[in-house]
Amino acid sequence: MRLSYLSLALAIIFVLTIMHASNVEAKASADPEPDAVGSINVKNLMDMIREQITSRLKK
């Protein structure tokens, strides 16, 4: 009889844990690095310059 109470208690704890976990939200604890955004812009700029140079060399 005790085993059934134990399994019932574990099942209730499991269900309550799942129900509580759905209310938890993840939040960022740090700001993004300022260099990360800048390096993306530099990469795009370098790609544009490379395309311009190659298109002018083909003419």
Swiss-Prot record:
Signal peptide stretch: 1-21
Tissue specificity comment: Expressed by the venom gland.
Keyword Secreted attributed: yes
Gene Ontology terms: cellular component: extracellular region
Residue ranges listed under propeptide: 22-38
Key word NADP present: no
Pfam annotation, one family: Pilosulin
Keywords associated with the record: Antimicrobial, Secreted, Signal
Predominant location: secreted
Superkingdom of this protein's organism: Eukaryota
Subcellular location: Secreted
Family of the protein in this entry: Belongs to the formicidae venom precursor-01 superfamily.
Entry function: May have antimicrobial properties, like most ant linear peptides.
Stated name of the protein: U-myrmeciitoxin(01)-Mg5a
Organism: Myrmecia gulosa
High-level lineage: Eukaryota, Metazoa, Ecdysozoa, Arthropoda, Hexapoda
